[in-house]
Every structure is written in C-alpha cells, then in structure tokens.
Regions:
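C-terminal end segment of the histidine kinase catalytic
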Residues: 210-235
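Two-component histidine phosphotransfer core
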Residues: 1-210, 218-220
Length: 235
C-alpha cells in the first residue's frame, strides 16, 4: 500500500511539474511575442513629444498603457472579446504611426466573444501586416472575422487577411515543414510563437493555416480552435 501511495504521489508530482513547465513556457513565449512593438511605441512617443503634439501623445500613452495591462495579466488564456479589444487598441497605436494608412474591418459574432484563446493570438498577425506591408501614404486593408464553423458549432474560426504582397514562399514552406520561419527579412518569431502556444494548449485540436489569398494576393491566416478548453489552464 505504501509503495502504491508513493507511486501515485510521484505521478501527481510529475503531472504538476509538467503543468508548471507548460505555464512557464506559455508565459515566456507570451512575453516574447512582440518586443519590437514596444520599441516602436517609444519612438512614436519621443517623436510626438518633440513635435509638441500633446493630444496625440496622451492618446498614445493611454493606448500603450491598455496594451501593457493586457499583456501583463499573466493568463495563458483570455476571452476573444478581450483579445479583439487588444487588437483594436493595437491598431489605434499603429494608426498614430501611419496616419490614413491602415483600414481594418472586424466581424465578430456575439456567440464567440466569451470563448477562451491565447492572448495576442490575433494581434500577432495584425502586427505582421503592419510590420511587412504597411507603408506611410499608402492604404493597407486588414479584415478580421471570428465565428463558429458551419461544420462544427464547437469550433471557432479566426480569419485574418490583408491586401499586401502576401507571405513569402519561404515562410509558407517553413510552416508546412514545421521549421523555424526565416526569410530575407529575418526570423518570423511571432508566427512560430503562435504555433507553439497552440500546440501546448490544444495539441491536435487546433489548426493554424497560412496562405496567400487568390483574389487580393495578400496574406491570409486561419486559426481553428475548440470552444471547450478546460478553464483551469487559464490560471
């Protein structure tokens, strides 16, 4: 009996250690998600201050404060409603960087707003569009749609599209082979980050698909998530 108890106790210890490791990995990857974003924000704040544009400076600091609060909450999961609020907040920051250059349309059905998902899941791809496609003085469109699939009402489909130049073929090849994602502009850490977090949280129950839209030629990303992930993973 003592040996059985020891074995059961050891199993519990191993399980709890795995949970702690996964939480640590999730938090580490979450914090790594967008380091350049903060540098860009500080540059905008500096420039607005130098130009004496105090109203825009106040807006920028408010948006950045909202973003920091969201990313520092420490949750491995959050509602899609909060994620979409974060994306909208992020795009407001970028619209201060690139006035009249970013147009975003969002469609989110009411029945998915409470579904749990990894933070920065959608923003990562909006950020890719801003980083690689947006040019001052030229309009770039971003479309974000979130809804349940017709085939399975317990699966949520997230679609992020733009009308830029699309994913380089080298990036698509790396994604298909599950390799680190490099192209001539360097490593695409954000996409790899999302892929790893999805695997840690959902394993085969989630899908990440990246391709180029045939109509616009822009990058298109689809993410499929189950809506019934265990909520205690959030803690």
């Amino acid at each position: 009996d003592d040996m059985i108890s020891q074995i059961e106790s050891l199993k519990i210890d191993v399980y709890e250690e795995n949970i702690r490791r996964q939480r640590a990995e999730l938090q580490y990857m979450k914090l790594q998600a967008n380091p350049h974003f903060y540098i860009n924000c500080l540059n905008v704040i500096h420039n607005l201050s130098m130009m004496g544009k105090n109203d825009l400076l106040q807006q920028m600091t408010t948006y950045l404060g909202n973003h920091l609060r969201y990313t520092m909450e420490g949750s491995a999961l959050d509602t899609l409603e909060k994620e979409m609020d974060c994306v909208e907040n992020y795009l407001r920051i970028q619209q201060l960087r690139f006035p009249d250059s970013i147009v975003c349309e969002m469609e989110v059905t009411q029945d998915v707003r409470s579904v749990l998902a990894p933070p920065l899941l959608i923003q990562t791809f909006a950020e890719n569009t801003v980083k690689y496609q947006v040019t001052a003085g030229e309009i770039t469109h971003i479309w974000i749609k979130v809804h349940r699939t017709e085939e399975n009402p317990h699966v949520v489909e997230i679609e992020i599209r733009d009308d830029g130049e699309g994913y380089p073929q080298s990036v698509l090849d790396c994604l298909e082979k599950n390799q680190k994602i490099f192209d001539k502009r360097g490593e695409h850490f954000g996409i790899r980050n999302v892929s790893q977090r999805l695997w840690l949280l959902y394993h085969d129950a989630a899908k990440l698909i990246c391709y180029n839209d045939k109509e616009t030629g822009g990058a298109c990303t689809k993410i499929y998530l189950p809506d019934d992930i265990v909520e205690n993973k959030q803690k």
